[in-house]
Amino acid sequence: MRIGLFTDTYFPQVSGVATSIRTLKTELEKQGHAVFIFTTTDKDVNRYEDWQIIRIPSVPFFAFKDRRFAYRGFSKALEIAKQYQLDIIHTQTEFSLGLLGIWIARELKIPVIHTYHTQYEDYVHYIAKGMLIRPSMVKYLVRGFLHDVDGVICPSEIVRDLLSDYKVKVEKRVIPTGIELAKFERPEIKQENLKELRSKLGIQDGEKTLLSLSRISYEKNIQAVLVAFADVLKEEDKVKLVVAGDGPYLNDLKEQAQNLEIQDSVIFTGMIAPSETALYYKAADFFISASTSETQGLTYLESLASGTPVIAHGNPYLNNLISDKMFGALYYGEHDLAGAILEALIATPDMNEHTLSEKLYEISAENFGKRVHEFYLDAIISNNFQKDLAKDDTVSQRIFKTVLYLPQQVVAVPVKGSRRMLKASKTQLISMRDYWKDHEE
């Protein structure tokens, strides 16, 4: 299969979306597929250094200077997509490259799948200070964009429910982004390495450690963690909070820690190298987050893969992820966070190896790649079915094809734009996928 991934955000820009796309690319290539990334130019990268990464001329996006917006080169992108003979397009943004991906898919008459990554209600205030787009407008803009895709990947149940509330009609599948487990399991990291890091950070023997690791922005709600941590210290003083990362809200947090008089128990590390991420997770007793703006949150998965339990604000996604007390504790109101921390410090059991291994496969990049590939197959089969149905047939012939769609593909399938899906049985669909897999090899 030849796959085009369209995104406004890719490395060297650092974000959860960029990480998710690179993970997907890696897993699809392991399965033997050819993957091409269509993205924006970047001043820190030679536009032509990788022939599988097609960079479209772009400028910084006015609301987010570290993000970019493509403004020309669309016809050239279509020409390249034709040359690469793409079978399917997978868009990862609702902005310039997302619109370009949908247009190219329609020109090539191939299906387009979209991943919805961001809850924009939490971010529209950045765009002209909320004067240009209001939160109430988001659902109409998103619904309009998704009207022209063949299916949507939702990284969590939160996103699926949100899009259902928006009255998005296309098929929605919950497929959480997986992570490369080997990057976080890291058996070469020994106890002495963890002890050395804790000593370097000023953590004493016998002290528990909470780790917050993210971009330091207001939306991450680290300020709520600091407030709760101040209450925790009144009950348990042998605990430290490590805040790792950098961002526009860092100085505000440092000032808040001073005002709460907890600065001696809070350690701000600044940005840490990606190669050290697993080391920090493993050196902590708990990963903690009070963010409510995540559609999934890869840091939760990274922490579990490192063997470190999580304390976080509960939601449908995390309710499924933190399915056992050994994986951590959830809370549902900011006033409950301090209590959740204290309970976790006292009552979290050790990790059970068997239960952990099952959870790790569930959140693995391998499982993620397989499930996305299955969605691609279903969309391609459906697209071929719709093309076949569109030929000059009589009404009776169309009905016959709908009921017994067996000519070249064996089965009828889901999804076509905003149209109702024709569902095949699970057995038929698996047979059809197997047929396509055989013909890809």
UniProtKB/Swiss-Prot annotation:
Its cofactor is Mg(2+). InterPro entries: Glyco_trans_1, Glyco_trans_4-like_N, Glycosyltransferase_grp1. It is an enzyme of class 2 (transferase). Keywords: Carbohydrate metabolism, Cell membrane, Glycerol metabolism, Glycosyltransferase, Lipid biosynthesis, Lipid metabolism, Magnesium, Membrane, Transferase. It is found in: Cell membrane. The keyword Cell inner membrane does not apply. GO terms for molecular function: 1,2-diacylglycerol 3-glucosyltransferase activity; hexosyltransferase activity; magnesium ion binding. It holds the Pfam family Glyco_transf_4. Gene3D superfamilies: Glycogen Phosphorylase B. Its EC number is 2.4.1.337. One of its GO terms (cellular component) is plasma membrane. Its main location: membrane. The keyword Membrane applies. It catalyses: a 1,2-diacyl-sn-glycerol + UDP-alpha-D-glucose = a 1,2-diacyl-3-O-(alpha-D-glucopyranosyl)-sn-glycerol + UDP + H(+). GO terms for biological process: glycerol metabolic process; membrane lipid biosynthetic process. Activated by the negatively charged lipid phosphatidylglycerol (PG). Belongs to the glycosyltransferase group 1 family. Glycosyltransferase 4 subfamily. PANTHER family: SULFOQUINOVOSYL TRANSFERASE SQD2 (PTHR45947:SF3). Glucosyltransferase involved in the biosynthesis of the non-bilayer-prone membrane lipid alpha-monoglucosyldiacylglycerol. This is a major component for maintaining a certain anionic lipid surface charge density, for balancing the bilayer to non-bilayer phase equilibria and for keeping a constant lipid bilayer spontaneous curvature (curvature packing stress). Catalyzes the transfer of a glucosyl residue from UDP-Glc to diacylglycerol (DAG) acceptor to form the corresponding alpha-glucosyl-DAG (1,2-diacyl-3-O-(alpha-D-glucopyranosyl)-sn-glycerol). It can only use UDP-Glc as sugar donor. This is Alpha-monoglucosyldiacylglycerol synthase. The lineage of its organism: Bacteria, Bacillati, Bacillota, Bacilli, Lactobacillales.
